[in-house]
Swiss-Prot record:
Enzyme Commission code(s) on record: 2.3.1.4
GO MF annotation terms: glucosamine 6-phosphate N-acetyltransferase activity
Keyword line: Acyltransferase, Transferase
Protein family per UniProt: Belongs to the acetyltransferase family. GNA1 subfamily.
Domain N-acetyltransferase: 1-111
Positions of acetyl-CoA binding: 47-49, 55-60, 90-92
GO cellular component: cytosol; nucleus
Acyltransferase keyword on record: yes
Name of this protein: Glucosamine 6-phosphate N-acetyltransferase
UniProt KW Zinc keyword: no
Amino acid sequence: MKKDFHSTYYIIVVEDLESHHVIGTATLFLERKFLRGKGICGHIEEVIVHPDHQRKAIGKLMVLTLIKLAFSLNSYKVILDCSDSNVGFYEKCGLSRAGIEMKKYASHSII
């Protein structure tokens, strides 16, 4: 397998400088799409902000930073999955609804 770019994952970690606790994290995963001429699709995942620090624009800053990073690395789009309760937050970050997520979890009997 040939690797066409240096990094696949980019992780943001936000630390409270007073308490030295992690108060937020977010991840960008870059995926090459065969049907898009090996174009890059950015996936934003695991956006988490500690409840004591929510509604302070930390999550929005992380998401906007990852979107900017994805496009600077030539992604043709950025996608993410979220619950219905988080749609408004992501719309404020400039994303819009597109499709329906499907999933199947691995059973616990897997080796």
